[in-house]
Regions:
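C-terminal motif of bacterial Sec signal peptides marking the signal peptidase cleavage site
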Residues: 17-20
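Alpha-helical transmembrane segments
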Residues: 11-15
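Short acidic-hydrophobic surface loop/beta-edge motif
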Residues: 8, 62-66, 148-150
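A beta-strand/beta-hairpin structural motif
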Residues: 32, 74-77, 101-178
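A generic structural micro-feature
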Residues: 86-91, 164-168
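A short beta-strand signature
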Residues: 88-103
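Start-of-domain signal
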Residues: 22-90
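Bacterial N-terminal signal peptides that target proteins for export
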Residues: 1-9
Length: 178
């Protein structure tokens, strides 16, 4: 009986030791990898990062905001109609591509949702309907038919990106309804 007890205790001890050793990465390591991936993407694409909003958006100039959003305005949109400026709770209808930042980018979403019976929409500044990064990007876009590219860190992205600590780049064009 003593031998049997020793075998059981030994087995329990061994299983405890083996279960405490795992090869998963820590959250801090995932954040570091995310930061490195973004830095590598910026370098590979010759992106110039600025901290003040440029008056003229040159090619490959991205604004780094306090939240960590990298934003580049491609097209101002319909700025000739000042009455058509985006306002709180306006319904935003985005068309967007979502890519990974890997050297060989994967297209995660390739949506032209405007043509869908139920397009992707959200109310501007209603945080329950879109991620913080989308609201911030749209705040810089302001006008119908505005187009921008932006890099979204996991912390300000959608929940699935946050859980996986995965940054994405979006190429987005917006329309909105008052």
């Amino acid at each position: 009986m003593k031998i049997f007890s020793k075998i059981i205790i030994g087995f329990l001890f061994l299983s405890f030791i083996l279960s405490s050793c795992n090869n998963t990465t820590t959250y801090a390591e995932q954040l570091k990898a995310e930061k490195e991936l973004i830095a590598d993407y910026i370098k590979r694409n010759n992106i110039k990062v600025v901290t003040e909003e440029p008056k003229v958006w040159d090619e490959n100039v991205y604004l780094l905001t306090e939240s960590g959003l990298y934003f580049h305005l491609i097209n101002v949109g319909d700025s000739a109609a000042p009455a058509e400026v985006l306002d709180t709770n306006d319904l935003v209808v985005p068309r967007f591509y979502q890519y990974t930042l890997n050297a060989k980018a994967d297209t995660i979403s390739n949506w032209n949702t405007v043509d869908y019976p139920y397009p992707t929409t959200f109310n501007y500044l209603d945080d329950s309907q879109a991620c913080a990064a989308w609201h911030e990007a749209v705040s810089y876009m302001k006008y119908n038919n505005s187009r921008a590219k932006f890099i979204v860190k996991s912390k300000i992205g959608f929940e699935d990106a946050s859980t996986a600590v995965t940054p994405y780049i979006y190429d987005m064009k917006i329309k909105f309804q008052k």
